[in-house]
Curated annotation (Swiss-Prot):
SUPFAM superfamilies the record matches: Ribosomal protein S16 (SSF54565)
InterPro entries for the chain: Ribosomal_bS16 (IPR000307), Ribosomal_bS16_dom_sf (IPR023803)
Alphabetic keyword roster: Ribonucleoprotein, Ribosomal protein
Similarity section: Belongs to the bacterial ribosomal protein bS16 family.
Record's protein name: Small ribosomal subunit protein bS16
């Protein structure tokens, strides 16, 4: 099953994360299928997203982790996905 989840980057005590699409059973920092954005928790929770690609993966059945889903909700992308499901 395909998941949207975070991989850790950055230095010690200065984390940054990539939002990636990868198989559910792969390692946290293993090979990703696609890189979909960045999340910087120490910089006022700055988020950079590739919206069209994320929506495409969600429409095709990729499941976000709890953390990624909360990031998408804050960015307003989850509402767009829910709206597109109703059509």
């Amino acid at each position: 099953m395909l998941k949207l989840r975070l991989t850790r980057l950055g230095d010690k005590k200065r984390p940054s994360y990539r939002i990636v699409a990868m198989e559910a059973l792969s390692k946290r920092d293993g090979g990703a299928i696609a890189y979909l954005g960045n999340y910087f928790p120490l910089e006022d929770s700055k988020v950079v997203l590739k919206e069209e690609e994320i929506l495409n993966y969600l429409k095709n059945g990729a499941q976000p982790t709890r953390t990624v889903k909360s990031i998408l909700v804050k960015a307003g992308l989850w509402a767009k996905f829910e709206e597109s499901k109703k059509k």
